[in-house]
Amino acid sequence: MAESIGYGIEEQIENFCSNHPNTKLIVIDTFQKIRTISNDNAYASDYRDISFLKSIADKLKIAIVLIHHLRKQKDDDPMNRVSGTTGITGGADSNFVLDRPKREGTRAKFFCTGRDIEDRSMELNFNRTSKIWDVIADSYETPEILLEDITATVVKFL
């Protein structure tokens, strides 16, 4: 089990990367389990936790993905739905939000934003047989390209 920020998580990550030198990615599920408990300003605490993990990632030249939950309340901006303060989204290099309107449903929207990436949104459908999210629409691609892909798939099928 992972330690929390300020209580051993840095050493755990460093030791793991030392024992597995080809490590490029660490996934922490969930961020809440390793957060510091603080009576400080909530924004400052959130930003400090993210900055701490970012400094470890930069030092070890790895990516750290934090799994975190969304608020139940709706908002036009998916980043505003991330639970906690904007210190979480503001401190990270990139943010990804998977929004599933219905837990049991197969449809979702995936939003990406960050310092070094273009903003992007995708409509997805979860294939329960293959266990893979299929891209239905992608803001990064022009509709013509998607239409060509769909047409090519239909022609190939026929």
Regions found by a protein language model. Give the residues of each.
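Conserved inter-motif catalytic segment of the P-loop NTP-binding fold
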Residues: 1-40, 48, 55, 129-130, ...
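Phosphate-binding/switch region of NTP-binding enzymes
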Residues: 25, 44-134
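Alpha-helix initiation/capping motif
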Residues: 41-42, 71, 148, 152
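Short amphipathic alpha-helical interface segments
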Residues: 143-158
